[in-house]
């Protein structure tokens, strides 16, 4: 209260009209026999109000009530006296304070004003240095923007090159797929030909088995024919032998005719005639028996030989026809087998060439894929490095922009302070800051810097897809305010569990603030403070972000729920 009165007197420059007063206060305890002035006055008035004869009318109970009333009145008077004494003490204290303040005010009025030229020069030097820093930051910003533009162009060219390589890779994959399909068709045709060749080989094996059977049968027939021929030759030899034997006997008979002796007469018998007749008889018997035997053998042999020859002739004709047919079939099958073998060899050569071409294309594709993967890894690394460099440049640019805005705010603040140097409070703050005294001027300067605005303007566009929406964003980057816009019958509480707020600058997320688990009631605001603006939260609907400053300048703020859906958006565009 004293400081308020002093400030009012200093600002208005008028003297106090309250004059010193003298009071004499006499206090007495409750048990004292002598009372204060007020007590005596009350007692006197009470005593004067009693008329004669009243005491006779009072009973013992009336006297007791009267005494209680008197004690009560005494206590009330004592309380009033104490309150009056405390009030008088306060008045004395305030009068003394007013005198002191009047003396200080008079001393300040009589005090000669000091020269502010050193302070003005110091602030002008600081302003010149600030302008120089701003110019340097502007040039650095231009270089950084040019570098960022070059990096973006390079990233765009690298992306186009990656797209070209990906298109080439797709073309190679399509070509490989078509070649694989063609190879599959060739393999299917080759498999069909192999099956057909296998069936032809099976038929050829069956024909060979049939030919082997026919040849075996021919061999058996030849063996039988050889046997019959040998028997026929043996019979011919036997007949020749018998013929020679007959010739021998005939010659022998002829010789006997030549060596015929003279007839011998025995007892009147002619032995020559006897011998001749007997011998002729024997020869005729032998000859007849031999002829019969020869005829029988010859007939049997001729019949058997004729039958065998007939069977051989018929079998040879049949076998010859079958053999000729089989030979023709074998020749035809050999021709077909030769053609199939040639076709198979041609297909095998073609398949080998296609397989070699496929392997070559596969190796080329593997090499191209490896090169493409290396290029992709390299380009991804380059993109990552460029992105990191771009992020660093953007962060540095954001820092420079924040520093520029801060310098602009400080310059505006200093300009206002210099323009308002007639204000005694402003002069006192500047003097205290110049001589290194930490007082009310420093806090006032700090508050003025934080609450001042730059010479630019900020355009804000808001949009929301639910009950939660942006309410405001502080231009100095100290806080963000969101609110639950529901009310009335549609009012509902919204939980912020898993929600976050993202700040996007130049298409990249520059900062992300994770909201705490809090339920916003309807028509209630929720404030997120920067760490540099507020140390700790003073209410449940406040949160301190783990960021020193939320930043200034053009940016986009987005509220994202736990599922990654955008619930509200605020676009801030700063111009100035």
UniProtKB/Swiss-Prot annotation:
Q: Where is this region: Linker 1?
A: 109-122
Q: Which Gene Ontology MF annotations are present? A: structural constituent of cytoskeleton
IF rod domain location: 73-425
- Localization annotation: Cytoplasm
Q: What is this protein called?
A: Non-neuronal cytoplasmic intermediate filament protein
Q: Where is this region: Coil 2?
A: 279-425
Head, as annotated region: 2-75
Assigned keywords, A-Z: Coiled coil, Cytoplasm, Intermediate filament
Instruction: Give me the ranges of the annotated region Linker 2.
Output: 261-278
Q: Which family is this protein grouped under? A: Belongs to the intermediate filament family.
* Biased composition range(s): Low complexity: 28-49
Which Pfam family is an annotated match for this chain, by its short name?
Answer: Filament
The region called Coil 1B is annotated at: 123-260
Alphabetized PROSITE patterns for the sequence: IF_ROD_1, IF_ROD_2, LTD
Tell me the organism: Cornu aspersum
Q: Where is this region: Disordered?
A: 1-51
Quaternary structure and partners: Can form homopolymers.
């Amino acid at each position: 209260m004293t400081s308020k009165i002093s400030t009012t007197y200093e600002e208005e420059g008028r003297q106090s009209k309250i004059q010193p007063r003298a009071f004499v206060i006499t206090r007495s305890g409750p048990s004292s026999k002598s009372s204060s002035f007020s007590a005596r006055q009350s007692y006197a008035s009470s005593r004067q109000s009693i008329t004669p004869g009243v005491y006779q009318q009072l009973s013992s109970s009336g006297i007791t009530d009267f005494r209680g009333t008197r004690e009560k009145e005494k206590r009330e008077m004592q309380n009033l006296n104490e309150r009056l004494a405390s009030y008088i003490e306060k008045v004395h204290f305030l009068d003394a304070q007013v005198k002191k303040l009047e003396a200080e005010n008079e001393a300040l009025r009589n005090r000669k004003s000091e020269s502010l030229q050193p302070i003005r020069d110091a602030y002008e030097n600081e302003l010149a240095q600030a302008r120089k820093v701003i110019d340097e930051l502007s040039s650095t910003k231009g270089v950084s923007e040019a570098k960022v533009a070059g990096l973006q162009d390079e990233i765009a060219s690298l992306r186009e090159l990656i797209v070209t390589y990906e298109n080439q890779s797709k073309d190679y994959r399509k070509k490989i797929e078509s070649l694989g399909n063609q190879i599959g068709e060739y393999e299917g045709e080759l498999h069909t030909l192999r099956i057909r060749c296998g069936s032809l080989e099976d038929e050829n094996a069956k024909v060979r088995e049939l030919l082997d059977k026919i040849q075996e049968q021919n061999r058996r027939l030849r063996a039988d024919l050889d046997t019959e021929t040998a028997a026929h030759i043996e019979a011919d030899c036997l007949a020749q032998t018998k013929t020679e034997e007959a010739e021998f006997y005939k010659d022998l008979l002829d010789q006997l005719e030549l060596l015929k002796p003279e007839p011998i007469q025995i007892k009147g018998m002619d032995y020559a005639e006897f011998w001749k007749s007997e011998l002729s008889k024997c020869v005729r018997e032998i000859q007849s028996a031999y002829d019969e035997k020869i005829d029988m053998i010859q007939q049997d042999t001729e019949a058997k030989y004729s039958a065998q020859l007939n069977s051989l002739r018929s079998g040879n004709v049949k076998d010859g026809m079958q053999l000729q047919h089989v030979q023709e079939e074998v020749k035809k099958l050999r021709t077909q087998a030769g053609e199939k073998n040639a076709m198979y060899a041609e297909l095998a050569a073609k398949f080998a060439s296609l397989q070699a071409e496929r392997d070559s294309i596969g190796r080329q594709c593997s090499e191209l894929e490896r090169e493409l993967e290396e290029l992709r890894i390299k380009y991804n690394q380059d993109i990552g490095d460029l992105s990191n460099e771009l992020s660093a440049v953007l962060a540095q640019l954001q820092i420079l922009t924040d520093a520029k805005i801060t310098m602009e705010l400080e310059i505006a603040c200093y300009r206002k302070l210099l323009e308002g140097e007639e204000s005694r409070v402003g002069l006192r703050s500047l003097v205290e800051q110049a001589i290194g005294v930490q007082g009310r001027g420093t806090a006032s300067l700090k508050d003025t810097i934080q609450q001042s605005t730059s010479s630019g303007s900020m355009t804000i566009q808001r949009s929301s897809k639910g009950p939660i929406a942006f309410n405001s964003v502080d231009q100095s980057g100290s806080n963000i305010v969101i609110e639950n816009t529901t009310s009335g019958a549609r009012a509902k509480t919204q939980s912020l569990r898993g929600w976050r707020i993202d700040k996007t600058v130049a298409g990249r997320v520059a900062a992300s603030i994770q909201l705490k688990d809090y339920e916003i009631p309807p028509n209630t605001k929720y404030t997120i403070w920067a760490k540099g603006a507020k140390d700790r939260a003073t209410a449940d609907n406040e949160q301190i972000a783990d960021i020193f400053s939320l930043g200034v300048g053009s940016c986009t703020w987005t509220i994202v729920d736990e599922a990654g859906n955008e619930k509200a958006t605020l676009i801030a565009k700063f111009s100035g």
